[in-house]
Amino acid sequence: MNDEFSRASEHIWKYFELHAQQRMTVFNFYIAITGLLAAGIGVTLQQGGKYVLFTSLMGVFVAFISFIFWKLDQRVSILIKNAEIALQDLECQFSNEKLRIITKDNSSNLLNLGISSSWTYGKCFRISFVIVGFTGILLAITPFLMKVSTS
């Protein structure tokens, strides 16, 4: 039983660690891509009317990338949650309740209550995806608004 417990805990922990790291890597990649696109949009906006269509296409691409990365994050979040559930099952076997840190964290009622409470990674990431995606849409229509205002 002890050997099986050790193998199970090692397997579950590696699974959790892999997907938690994957989530952070994917988000870092998202930040890098959208940062480069934002810089490109800034340059094309400075050029004026020459690159109106390109600016709009990059804005649409920012919104599209935000949606794709949001969906990727949803999937990884499910995988992490599965690992947390398995880790909680293992923690139930601990006689010392102070060692049940994942169970304690998941039963916390202090997460995501409001602006001043602690937020989960998921909530922070989702807010980022929405804001950047919405900004991409605004940047897609900005050149046309600038064109109308100068006419």
UniProtKB/Swiss-Prot annotation:
Coiled coil: none annotated. It comes from the Bacteria. The chain crosses the membrane at residues 25-45, 52-72, 127-147. One of its GO terms (biological process) is defense response to virus. Keywords: Antiviral defense, Cell inner membrane, Cell membrane, Membrane, Transmembrane, Transmembrane helix. It is a multi-pass membrane protein. Disruption phenotype: Required for CBASS function; when deleted from a plasmid encoding the whole CBASS locus, CBASS no longer confers resistance to bacteriophage lambda. GO terms for cellular component: plasma membrane. It is found in: Cell inner membrane. The keyword Translocase does not apply. Belongs to the Cap19 family. Membrane protein component of a CBASS (cyclic oligonucleotide-based antiphage signaling system) which provides immunity against bacteriophage. The CD-NTase protein synthesizes cyclic nucleotides in response to infection; these serve as specific second messenger signals. The signals activate a diverse range of effectors, leading to bacterial cell death and thus abortive phage infection. A type III CBASS system. Expression of this CBASS system (Cap17-CapW-CdnC-Cap7-Cap6-Cap18-Cap19) in a susceptible E.coli (strain JP313) confers resistance to bacteriophage lambda cI-. This is CD-NTase-associated protein 19. It comes from Escherichia coli. The gene is cap19.
